[in-house]
Amino acid sequence: MKLSKLLFILVLVLSLTGCKEYGEKRIVKLLTVSDDKISIYYYDYSADKPSYSVAEKENTGIENTLVQLLSDHEYDLKLCRYVVCDSNIIENNIEELFNGLVNSKFSMDTVIIQGDTDAEPEKYTELKKYSYPIYSYYVENGKINGIVENVADNTKNVISDSKLHTILTQQQSFAFDIIKNNIDKGTYVFEHNGVQLSANLENITVFCTVKNDTAQIKVNAMLKNFKGMPSNKTSKQQFMEIAQNSIENNIISLLDDRYMTEKLKLNWFDNLCSCNAVDIEVNLK
């Protein structure tokens, strides 16, 4: 086979598949979720002429369907600002939806919206043109407790950066509540000089503050009902250190590879939101 023919075939293959160096460049702008289907709207830059396209699958479970949908091609999720859901998804499946977004590594800039999933996608591409209600939920004692922000009315809304920032901050608290609710609140047992000691871990609170796109996490925990607590001051201090290390290790184990780059460093959503070190405070009383 002649060299010129080989070069022609190589160029043809690259033009059909997209050069590996640049990737496929499918930029997702919108995700819609209904009972029937999940759709992603994206700009396809892999072709010679960029085009607005849609990919969708039957909704057989939000988390699994999202994984299947996003595995068909290489998508860039950094600019996906909106997730539009039917009202019953918001009411009945909000936690499953949020878990799906976390597992699929959607941007922290993504705002969950109750709206019309059959509306024209152009309605969602520019914030100033958007007129559907935007909801932000907060979690208390492991339960979704209500609507924090509802900017819906019958006119078009221009949402200020500060208001949007408030919504994003409360969306982030969702993720940290997931961490909090998975921390084992059972009895911790320690060995100290051959003596078995124990205490109950209670009153865990996870705080998150966001400033200039940087998140600071603080975890407060409390140990109570000590059994076998040494009376010696030095031994008591050693016990406290052992207890604190045990709690910290328990919390760290929850921050798996999706969130961690190194010990106590978080890497939320591929550096889209840079985070400081986790600040773990343990109150031992």
Residue spans for each PLM region:
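Membrane-proximal alpha-helical signals and transmembrane carboxylates
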Residues: 2-8, 16-285
